[in-house]
Amino acid sequence: MNSELRKIRWGVLGYARIARVELIPAIRRAANAEFHALASRDEGKLAEARAQFPGLARTYRGYEELLRDPEVDAVYVPLPNALHCAWTIRAAEHGKHVLVEKPAGLNAAECRAMIDACRAHGVRLMEAFMYRYTARTRAVLEVIRSGVLGEIKQVHATFRFLLANPASIKLRPELGGGALYDVGCYPVNFVGLVVDAMAGGEPGAGGQPESVAVECVRAGGIDTNFSALLKYPSGLLAAVHCGFNAHKRVAAELTGTLGVLEIPDTFFDPAGALTLTIGEERREIPVAASDRYRHEVEDFSDAILQRRAPQFSLAETLRNAEVMDRLLAASR
């Protein structure tokens, strides 16, 4: 690919809801990207996409056909979790850069295989944790790095919602369903972000928990309610919660020796505020709305154009998978 290209031409493998509602519109808003091609095995979905996104250059009935398109520079993979590894590797073999939806793989072994394949073929790979591109996340990091909380001793992070669709692929174990894979990966990643910031900010610097404990409720072969406690060598205790079987809650809290930071809508990007309590003083830290998916697309596209690493690192992807492996093993 010519590094002087002003825009990265994107292909999308599958017309999943997140692609239709979030990523494809974000690609179209991005300054350095264009939505070039879509592959779906459903002709009805392709017709819908052509109507919804005028100017879509090419549509394909097979994923392999799209990967053979020489004009596609990068692909987004929003397929069911169990298909991420195989199609990421196939994309790399065709010389395509890959933004893969979280979780990148079902386990650390799959993630290593994906990373190795992308490195072997000289293409970029990034896991799509869009919350890392919000003003809210930047504000959290600024508070941690300021030291105003003192030494952080506890982290609580929750991402849950009530899943009302009994036919959802999120409930199918053979496709990589389950609450931990679907939404629990966010709190796990958030804890990693916090411990890295505490350790100086380098990806992976915060290391692994020294022990984990899990309680889990299962139904239909998947976890539907999942809570874990992670203990780190520093003495930090992190509690992560996720589930499909209760009212929506997305929040986090950091407790240090000097204060507490409350983070509503932790993984979303509306305008709002964090609440910082230091001693008896309580104040709000306003955060602006963020176009998180567009920023994610622009960062990855720029990383390709400038031949640099994207903001979200493969070291973090691998660590997240390793921690989730431990949590899943402890839940069985």
Q: Model-predicted segments: where are they?
A:
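C-terminal helix-rich "cap/oligomerization" subdomain common to oxidoreductases
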Residues: M1-E4, A74-Y76, P233, I285, ...
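Conserved SAM-binding strand-loop segment of SAM-dependent methyltransferases
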Residues: L56-G62
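Beta-strand-loop-alpha-helix segment that lines the small-molecule cofactor/substrate pocket
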Residues: A74, P80-R132, G147
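Contiguous beta-strand/loop segments that form the cofactor/metal-binding neighborhood of enzyme cores
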Residues: E4, N189-D269, V287, E298-R308
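Predominantly a Rossmann-like dinucleotide-binding segment in NAD(P)-dependent oxidoreductases
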Residues: Y131-V212
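N-terminal Rossmann-like dinucleotide-binding module
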Residues: M1-P54
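Active-site loop of classical SDR/Rossmann-like NAD(P)-dependent oxidoreductases
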Residues: I18, V287-E298
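Short polybasic amphipathic segments
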Residues: A252, P270-G279
